Every structure is written in structure tokens, then in C-alpha cells.
């Protein structure tokens, strides 16, 4: 707090989030209800079932943080949690959040996130029919490289030196190997590359600009979400649903994209999110200081956050006339024409 005189030995924080299940109003089959059914609650007889999550965390003077994720099973009239239950790792993975940071050099975060996404997809692929072909090809590559005169000479000297030091039965003959025949080992070296480049045909993604890396990460997230959605609906048989374990809900959070992207890219991001995200299985949040972003978002979806004199965040919405007409059209066009006012 801004008026704090002495730092306490421990700070505490809690956050709660409600997830509603409007798909229960329909009789269609879905993959989202079953994992959360045991923790669903209703606030009224005709209400929509929901699940409430509560994240509790404490931070010591040294900055070490302890956190706990809980289900809120019962709360009083003021919303204070009375009965809770821990969220298991299996249930935690049912909801995934992908975060695109605001800093201009997001390479570390994006590289880790991209590898995690690709790894999850590749582990869900059935490689059994390809193992024999891959092993045959990798053996040919190793034999071709090993037949080099210089490599042969070095291998002979290495073998002689090693045998003078090691007399055991096992590990008696060292060889230079260049490539593994196991598919899982090969996949660890997989990367995303682009063609064509300015000075070479194949360009690794590490050479992209900060903005391009951000767009690549978003592309991977949206692609992964599309695959998971298709697998859950039974529209795709290319991945093993038990290995892929698609989340029942995906949240994409983008912080101040104007920091690393040119203005003309912002519209493309919003369009990509509009076409891929939505419905009962996904949601996207964009935090921004750029008024131009408001032109690309429906006024009903805009939330304005501001600190009051006590440094408590107040959330405001744009009030639109209830019925469609000239008044509603006027307010909507005013937001898009003069977003800096809002």
C-alpha cells in the first residue's frame, strides 16, 4: 500500500473466479461438464451451474510465495468461503491460460511457451508406423558421416586411447554418433522455421522481431486450441485424445500489444481472436492503453479499470441504451469515432 509505514512479515492475497456452464441449458453432448460436475453449485433454482475457484497466496519478506488453488464449495451471503476443497493437478489442467507479456523482448517466455505447446501436440501423435522408416534413414545419415576420412582417423585414435584407459567388458568401443534413431529424441530438436528469408531459404524463428515472435506465439496458441476443439468434437482423428488432453476451457491474455506490435497488426490480432475464440470453451482478454484498440472491439465487451483515491480498482462499463435504435447506434459510433474519450 502507498501509505504503508512498516512492511509486515507476511502478505496475503486471494483471487476468486467463477466459471459458468451455459452448455447445460442444451441437451447436446459436451466434454466440459464431466470433469467439473462434482464441484458445481447453483446460486438459484433457475440459475446456471458454476464452479468457483479460489487462489490463495502468501509472500514472505524474502519474496518467497506459497500458493494454493481451491474449489469454493460453500459461501455465506457475503461471498466469504466457508467450505473449500483442493484442486487436483488433473482438474487444474482442464483450464489453461496463455499469456502474451507486454515487454519488448518476450523471447524467453515465448520460446518456453511455444516448446510446451508443440511438445504437447507431438506427444499425442501416433508414431508407430513411422519408427522403422525414421530409424532406417537416420542410420544412413550416421553411416554417411562416419565414413568421412577425418572422422575415421579421429575415431581410431579415440578407440586406441580409450582402450588404454578402460579395460572393462562393457563400454569398450567408443564411436562418434551424429544422430539418434529414436523419434522422441529427434523431436526435442524440432523448431519453427520460415521460408523464404532475405539471405537464406530457411530462417529460424529466433531471428524474428519481437512483434513477429509475439504473433508466432499467438498463432501457435490458436492452432493448438483449434486442434483441441476439433479432437473433443470428434472432427479430427489425427491426435490421441487421451494423450493430448485438450483443456475444457482456454483463456488467452494479451498485455499491451501496442508495446511490441505496429498499429496495423493490432486489428489483425483482434480479427484472429474473434474468428478463433468464443463460445463456451474459450475467452480472450486484452489489456491496453491504446485508444485505437477500442475501435476494433464491440462496446459491450469494453471494461475500464481505474484506481480510486484509496487505490482500489473500480471497473466500469459503457452504458448502452437497452433497445436497438438511434440512441444505441449513436453511442456505439461515438466509441468507435472518439475512443480517447472513453
Regions flagged by a language model, labelled:
Residues 106-113, 119-252:
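Extended helical coiled-coil dimerization/tether regions that scaffold
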Residues 269-273:
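Conserved hydrophobic alpha-helix in the ABC-type ATPase nucleotide-binding domain
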Residues 262-263, 267, 296:
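Conserved D-loop-proximal element of ABC-family nucleotide-binding domains
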Residues 1-139, 152, 202, 323-324:
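Glycine-rich phosphate-binding loops of NTPases
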Amino acid at each position: 500500500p502507498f501509505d504503508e509505514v512498516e512492511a509486515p512479515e507476511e502478505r496475503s492475497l486471494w483471487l476468486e473466479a467463477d466459471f459458468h456452464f451455459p452448455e447445460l441449458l442444451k441437451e447436446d453432448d459436451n466434454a466440459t461438464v464431466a470433469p467439473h460436475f462434482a464441484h458445481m453449485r447453483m446460486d438459484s433454482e433457475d440459475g446456471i451451474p458454476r464452479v468457483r475457484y479460489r487462489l490463495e497466496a502468501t509472500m514472505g519478506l524474502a519474496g518467497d510465495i506459497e500458493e494454493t488453488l481451491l474449489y469454493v464449495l460453500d459461501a455465506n451471503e457475503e461471498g466469504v468461503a466457508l467450505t473449500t476443497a483442493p484442486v487436483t493437478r488433473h482438474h487444474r489442467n482442464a483450464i489453461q491460460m496463455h499469456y502474451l507479456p507486454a515487454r519488448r523482448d518476450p523471447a524467453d517466455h515465448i520460446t518456453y511457451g511455444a516448446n510446451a505447446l508443440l511438445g504437447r501436440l507431438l506427444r499425442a501423435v501416433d508414431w508407430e508406423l513411422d519408427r522403422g522408416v525414421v530409424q532406417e534413414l537416420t542410420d544412413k545419415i550416421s553411416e554417411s558421416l562416419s565414413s568421412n576420412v577425418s572422422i575415421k582417423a579421429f575415431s581410431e585414435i579415440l578407440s586406441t586411447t580409450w582402450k588404454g584407459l578402460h579395460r572393462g567388458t562393457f563400454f569398450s568401443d567408443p564411436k562418434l554418433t551424429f544422430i539418434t534413431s529414436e523419434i522422441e529424441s529427434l523431436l526435442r530438436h524440432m523448431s519453427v522455421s520460415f521460408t523464404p528469408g532475405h539471405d537464406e531459404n530457411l530462417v529460424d524463428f529466433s531471428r524474428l522481431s519481437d512483434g513477429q515472435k509475439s504473433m508466432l506465439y499467438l498463432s501457435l496458441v490458436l492452432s493448438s486450441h483449434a486442434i483441441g476443439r476439433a479432437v473433443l468434437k470428434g472432427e479430427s482423428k489425427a491426435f490421441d485424445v487421451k494423450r493430448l488432453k485438450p483443456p475444457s476451457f482456454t483463456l488467452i491474455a494479451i498485455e499491451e500489444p501496442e508495446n511490441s506490435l505496429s498499429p496495423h497488426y493490432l486489428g489483425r490480432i483482434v480479427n484472429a481472436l474473434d474468428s478463433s475464440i468464443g463460445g463456451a470453451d474459450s475467452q480472450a482478454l486484452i489489456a491496453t492503453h491504446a485508444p485505437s484498440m477500442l475501435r476494433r472491439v464491440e462496446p459491450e465487451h469494453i471494461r475500464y479499470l481505474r484506481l480510486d483515491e484509496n487505490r482500489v480498482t473500480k471497473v466500469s462499463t459503457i452504458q448502452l441504451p437497452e433497445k436497438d435504435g438511434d440512441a444505441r447506434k449513436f453511442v456505439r459510433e461515438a466509441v468507435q469515432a472518439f475512443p480517447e474519450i472513453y
